[in-house]
Structure formats: C-alpha cells, structure tokens
C-alpha cells in the first residue's frame, strides 16, 4: 500500500530526502511451497514492479527532494537454524532489487544495497556455524546485529567512513600538541608522572547498545555486529595518542572519573576512547540513545494505528472514520489476523485525536530535550603514572 500512502506519509511532510525500500512482503511466502511456485513468484514480482512504476512517476514529479532506493535486507535461505524455509524467496527479492538499481541509475537517484552484503557476511559466518543468521526468529526480520550492519552500509554509502569523532596526538616529552582533528585541546600541562589537558570534541561517540532489545524475539545486540563489520574503525574513532611518555602504566581519568589503566605502549599506538562506555561523553551519548528509543516507542504507536487504517479500514470505506463502526469491522477481522491482534489495542487508543495529540507533544518534548543536551562539553583528561 505504499502508493496509497505517499501523500499522507511522505509528500504532505515536505521532505528533502526520501528513501524507498520494498520486496520482502511483495514476493510472498507460502507460494514457494506450491508446485507452480516459479509462476506464482513471477506474478508477485510483476505486481510489485507495476506498483513501483506508479510510485516512480510520483517521485519523478517531485523535484525538490533527493530520492534514494534501498535494496532490502535478505531472506536467509542458507542458515540451518530450522527447516522452515521458503526456497528461492531471496532470488525473487533480488529480481526486485535489480529493477530498483536500474531505476535509480536511469533517474539519477541514490541506491544502497543491503541484501548482498548481508548475504556474504552470513555465508562466511555459516562456514563456522551453520546456524548463524541475522534473522533468528523467522529468516526475515534482522536482529539488532543485522540492523546495525544495515546502518553501517547506509552510512558507508553516504561517504561518511573515515570521519572521526575526534583525533588527538600529543608529544608528552615536549608538551606539544602534534595534531588534533574535530576537537579543541587546551591547557595542556606536563605534570610529575603524567600530563593533563582540556578536551572539547565537535561530536559524541556512538553508544553501542550491548543489550538485546526491541521486538521480534531479538537475541543479539548492536555490539555483536562489531565482529562482522569495521564500524568502530570507520565511524567511531575517538583516538588519543600520547608519544614519548616515560615507560610504564598510567591511570586515565576524565573529569576525575577513572576510565582505565593503560600502558605507555598502548598510548604510543593510540587508544580509542569510544571503546570505553564509562567516559562522560559516552554516558552523555547513552542518555541521548535512550531518549531516542523512548521517542521510537511512541512513534511506533502511530505506525500501528496507520497500518490498521490502511490495511483494513480503507478497503471498507472507513479510512480515518475512527468510530464504533470501524471498531466493529476490525473485530470481524481479529479472529483470523494475528498481525491485527498485535496492533488492535493501539488503534483503540490512537483513534482518539486527543490521545494522538498528547503522544505528538511528548515526542516533540523528547526531540527538543535531545537537541538541548546533544552538544559536547569540555572535559579534563588526565594521565597519571602508576608504575
């Protein structure tokens, strides 16, 4: 129903960027168990692309926004996690992605492929563990590690790899700031058995969520993805290098808080402060992460509400009726639709405009708070020799 929702979901909001992805649901599921699966699959693909051609025309008519097509994440056909399998489903998805890629090239739009990079990672990992998959529940929905890989691919496609959080290099012997990028360093002092300085970065480290969270039976965390992609190296470098220190070990503190004991050799090579969840700047980023997760939880209620409107009530002539007749119609669908059963409770609340208004104000408060507290602050960094 993408084309039916373009105005309400996209164009009415006057966006400057639009990303579009589709293919997983379009290609069907149990059709791959039927004898004429190939024929049914081709029909589903053609129906999807026919709808896309209409969407493409609408997007071409809008010349004040940048368009990006995304080749969606893969259906994992190769994991041995279980025997429930829609064989050749990802092949069907790839045919849709090929059409997306060609359309993007023809129209001068951006294009990002999530599918094949995720397939390649999965195949490599399955050589070591045949049950490895990004989609542990159903071969469809990526867990948090898979979502993190998708984020990495999206950032990399924008040419952002190599942009550091900050980079500092200090010659301790001469009390000399050799270089600094994306930050300010001041009040550099050589002290007995160490040194100290004030540090103000232009950005915050990315806080990797180490706890599995959010829907679809997730079991893995963002941090689990760090063994699969060079995210820390390419996107999350908060590097501190100190050369010509007296040989030994040093206590690293920031704003008086103990961070770690590190050797002069480690400091000579450079350490990545973004690896330390206990730094004040990392903790600041964590607060922002949790606030944004709270915003997401509220925004998800609107998603469930609108999905119910367009998937069930629109075809009944009850789009945004939000009345007893709409409720009664949904109750007819409830016994036979598990997805509706998951969304129904949110619809019964969101159907009231006063409730939606309160939720909207709450989200705005969260976003305003994020932008008030997302500015890096100056920190006192100190290295003290301990042995």
Language-model segments: which ranges?
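Alpha-helical cap/lid subdomain in secreted, periplasmic
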Residues: 3-387
């Amino acid at each position: 129903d993408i084309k039916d929702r373009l105005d309400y979901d996209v164009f009415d909001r006057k966006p400057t960027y639009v990303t579009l992805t589709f293919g997983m649901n379009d290609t069907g599921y149990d059709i791959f168990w039927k004898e004429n699966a190939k024929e049914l699959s081709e029909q589903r693909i053609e129906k999807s692309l026919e709808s896309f051609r209409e969407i493409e025309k609408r997007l071409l008519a809008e010349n004040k926004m940048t368009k990006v097509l995304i080749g969606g994440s893969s259906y994992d056909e190769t994991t041995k996690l279980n025997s429930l399998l829609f064989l050749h489903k990802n092949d069907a998805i790839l045919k849709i992605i090929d059409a997306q890629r060609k359309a993007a090239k023809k129209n001068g739009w951006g294009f990002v492929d999530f599918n094949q990079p995720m397939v390649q990672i999965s195949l490599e990992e399955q050589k070591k563990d045949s049950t490895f998959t990004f989609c542990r529940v159903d071969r469809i929905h990526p867990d948090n590690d898979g979502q993190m890989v998708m984020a990495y691919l999206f950032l990399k496609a924008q040419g952002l790899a190599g942009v550091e959080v900050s980079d500092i290099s200090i010659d301790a012997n001469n009390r000399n700031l050799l270089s600094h990028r994306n930050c300010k360093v001041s009040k550099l002092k050589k002290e007995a058995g160490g040194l100290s300085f004030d540090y103000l970065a232009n950005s915050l480290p990315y806080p990797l969520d180490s706890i599995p969270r959010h829907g679809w039976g997730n079991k893995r965390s963002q941090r689990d993805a760090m063994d699969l992609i060079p995210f820390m190296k390419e996107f999350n470098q908060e590097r501190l290098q100190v050369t010509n220190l007296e040989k030994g070990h040093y206590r690293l503190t920031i704003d008086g808080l103990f961070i770690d004991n590190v050797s002069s050799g480690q400091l000579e090579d450079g350490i990545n402060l973004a690896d330390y969840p206990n730094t004040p700047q990392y903790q600041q980023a964590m607060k922002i992460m949790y606030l944004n997760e709270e915003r997401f939880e509220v925004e998800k209620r609107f998603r469930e509400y609108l999905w119910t409107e367009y998937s069930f009530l629109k075809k009944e002539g009850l789009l945004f009726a939000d009345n007893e007749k709409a409720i009664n119609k949904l109750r007819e669908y409830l016994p036979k639709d598990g997805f509706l059963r998951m969304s129904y409770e949110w619809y019964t609340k969101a159907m009231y405009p006063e409730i939606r208004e309160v939720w909207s104000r709450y989200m705005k408060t969260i976003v305003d708070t994020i932008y008030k507290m997302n500015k890096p602050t100056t920190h006192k960094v100190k290295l003290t020799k301990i042995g």
